[in-house]
């Protein structure tokens, strides 16, 4: 229904909110169970750019950021929001420290260049699924 709203330019899937609404234990279960695939196919049909969140760091997070970022490329995502854990301002108060954290965006951009030429998206999708099942204890 949302894809028919007039004036809609882009859609962002809030994985945390959606996973809570669906009673999931972990927000990336929505990648593993095909929910995101199903949604983005509808957005593609409607010609709407889309994205989903969130990305911590390439190595950080329960599900490594590299795996999440590669899923963005597999699914044709046009945007991602950095997660709170990327730069937790409740813990990081020093501006210099914040600047250092954001310098890591360079490594994310470099990894994106690799993703643009990747041919192992299906392999990554399976790895994500297995990792998520392990995280949620199934």
What is each residue range found by the language model?
Residues 1-138:
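Expand to "…catalyze enediolate/carbanion chemistry for C-C bond making/breaking, isomerization
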